Design a protein with these regions (language model features):
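Condensing-enzyme catalytic core mediating Claisen C-C bond formation in acyl metabolism
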Residues: 62-139, 143, 147
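Phosphate/pyrophosphate-binding loops at sites that engage ATP/ADP/AMP, CoA/4′-phosphopantetheine
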Residues: 148-164
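Conserved catalytic cysteine-centered active-site region
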Residues: 1-45, 178
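Beta-strand segments within the central parallel beta-sheet cores of soluble alpha/beta enzyme folds
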Residues: 16-19, 43-51, 86-88, 161-167
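Flexible, glycine-rich active-site loops centered on histidine and acidic residues
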Residues: 39-73
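Acidic, glycine-rich active-site loops and adjacent beta-strand->loop/helix elements
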Residues: 22-25, 50-55, 91-93
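Glycine-rich phosphate-binding loops at beta-strand->alpha-helix junctions
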Residues: 1, 163-178
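Acidic-glycine-rich active-site phosphate/pyrophosphate-binding loop
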Residues: 1-11, 49-54, 114-122, 176-178
Length: 178
């Protein structure tokens, strides 16, 4: 996708273009990548274009997921400012990789059936469709995310009052209140 957009925007060939395929965390990782590239080079500006078309990845008859995933896009322009940094904390949770997964996604299973099947949770989908274990994602969000935010503020020697907003990537109102 990055190279397609590079062509459509008629960008110079000296302009780097690459994809970061990380789903929910792609924006945070991409912002850190752009920040690091700018801090360690003569790059003065970076354009981050994020987009998801998850409606294509969820089976329309999978009632457990179809209402949770949507499509969206945004573009953010980064500009180098002397003595200013974009700080962040990147984390991964490999133990929970099965909580949101397209079982036949990527190149893991090269010849799965494309036929929709009825799964044990009572929902219909193919092995190519994204599936989410809502209970596991909820548990992770309630247990780990607040601790990560606290750890980050300790690392940066800040408090909640330091920030104008905390913007969370979560559709669940109950989780936001936690």
């Amino acid at each position: 996708t990055a190279c397609v957009l590079h062509k459509r925007l008629h960008l110079d060939r000296n302009c780097a273009a690459f994809d970061v395929n990380l789903g929910c965390s792609a924006f945070v990782y991409s912002a850190q990548i752009i920040s690091a590239l700018m801090a360690n080079s003569d790059i003065d500006k970076g354009l981050l274009i994020v987009g998801e078309t998850m409606s294509r990845m969820v089976h329309p008859e999978d009632k457990s997921s179809v209402m949770l995933f949507g499509d969206a896009g945004a573009a953010i322009l980064f500009e180098k400012v002397p003595d200013n940094k974009l700080s962040g904390m990147l984390c991964s949770e490999g133990e929970g990789y099965k909580a949101i997964i397209a079982p036949a996604g990527g190149f893991r299973n090269l010849k799965p059936t494309e036929e929709a099947m009825l799964f044990s949770d009572g929902n219909k989908r193919t092995l190519y469709n994204t599936w989410m274990d809502g209970a596991k994602v909820f548990e992770f969000t309630i247990r780990d995310v607040p601790q990560t935010i606290k750890h980050y503020m300790e690392y940066e020697n800040t408090s909640p009052d330091t920030y104008d907003y905390f913007i969370m990537h979560q559709a669940n109102k109950y989780i936001h209140k936690q």
